[in-house]
Amino acid sequence: MRESDEQRAYREQRTDELIWERARTLGMSRKRFLALLASGAGAAAALGLDGRLGAAQAQDHAPHFNQYADWFVKPTPAEYFIDHGHAKEMRWEVMKGRDYTVSNDLFYVQNHFPVPRIDPRAYKLRVHGDAVEREVEFSLDELQKLPSVTLTRAVECGENGRVFFAVQYKKQMDGAQWRLGGIGVAEWTGVPMRAVLERARVKPGARDVMPVGLDGGQDFRNLAARPIPLDKAMADDTLLVYGMNGQDLPPDHGGPVRTLVSGWIGPASIKWTGRVEVSSKVLISIFNTEYGVMIGPDYPPQPPFPGVVCTWQNVKSAFELPMNTVLPSGPQVVSGRSWSGKSNIRKVDVSLDGGKTWEPARLREPNIEKAWVRWDVDWTAVPGNYIFRARATDNLGQTQPDKGPPYNFHGYLYDGVVDHPVRVF
């Protein structure tokens, strides 16, 4: 997957705006500023990447919470999760025969910092910035009194499928070796972000909105934040969430309040959201300049972005089976799920012989956009070794390619058809 027109437009617009803004701040021409960047001398400081940006933009306005606790609060037993240290990947086999949504106890967890223990009674959400007419603050109770919505949406780690880059390029990447279990679908209840932004009276010149979490520090490298464009923040399915699957939002998943940026990579859906900055300028964080960026020969850098910024999730499929599974011979129902960050799924084709033949899978309702669809095929298994493959196409016509995207340093957004080895005895 090379850089799409949409990704390129997003990158070029943000880059151009940031260059103009930084040049004006430093009192120099755009040409002189670009020359400074090209020289490398003082480039980080010129761009505001020297560690002071987050501290300058942030204020100590967090609600009271205890000292950092563990990386995880809920039990994460090995029979349900693959341990990646600071992340817990859902084992796909646990979804066999289960409901459409993933229960809270089975939902994957990816944290950048330990879980803050926040007292819901003391929680405050602050909306501020130079692009709002007034600063506003909400308690949890005040948020819950606003008109709420419940949406079924996926949250998916941008690194989901990373291990298959290693398979494809014969080169292991740093970080958690995610298979395909870095995704979950839940019913999320909350308030459209638009509603709280409207209370703050967003100015006409607003450009970027940046939710900030309470789990990190206040310096640039430790600020748990990810900017999004104003139009994405105002979308109907961008929420400030306080409920998950009919329960209060659990601590592991961002409780008491998190952001949900539907369809985008998981790091955009900031957990433990404590404030939202609205700016007339381009906002940057470590999660759209160093992480959350595809870096490699096929992803041209344009400072401050060293590559292509990850936004929308792509199309993927997974079998509800362990990798390298062993099955008995006889009649089988082979099942799985497929999903897309932009749409719902139109069709899924399945091969049980390594791609020699394909057959359409039966899709099972519901089939919700930006979530997933369940599917299955019948199979009479005889002893031997097999390679299962699944290839989904969404309603926008996006189809999983045979291979994943060009190599990128962090291993983001793998979407290729995955080989799933199976042995029948």
Please give the residue ranges for each predicted region.
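Intrinsically disordered, low-complexity sequence elements enriched in Ser/Thr/Gly/Pro
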Residues: 20, 28-30, 50, 89, ...
